[in-house]
Amino acid sequence: MSCCGGNCGCGSSCKCGNGCGGCKMYPDMSYTESSTTTETLVLGVGPEKTSFGAMEMGESPVAENGCKCGSDCKCNPCTCSK
């Protein structure tokens, strides 16, 4: 998935918007060392997801006014009313 400032999706005037999470879809998992704070991160616990909606069918997950996010995070095709 391409990213546009962390947000990939078509907004007004076929510009990049806040449609999907893009690069910022997952929380920051960077490592920082601290002697006073303890943090526990648990991964992989939860019910199994059996359906992925539009992603499963190969469609773009974001479409607004006929716009879909292209490979370089420019809306393609652009059929928005401007």
UniProtKB/Swiss-Prot annotation:
It comes from the Eukaryota. GO terms for molecular function: metal ion binding. Induction: Strongly up regulated by heavy metals. Keywords: Metal-binding, Metal-thiolate cluster. InterPro entries: Metalthion_15p (IPR000347). The keyword Nucleotidyltransferase does not apply. Mainly expressed in flowers and first leaves. The keyword Ligase does not apply. Coiled coil: none annotated. Metallothioneins have a high content of cysteine residues that bind various heavy metals. Belongs to the metallothionein superfamily. Type 15 family. This is Metallothionein-like protein type 2 B. It comes from Solanum lycopersicum (Tomato).
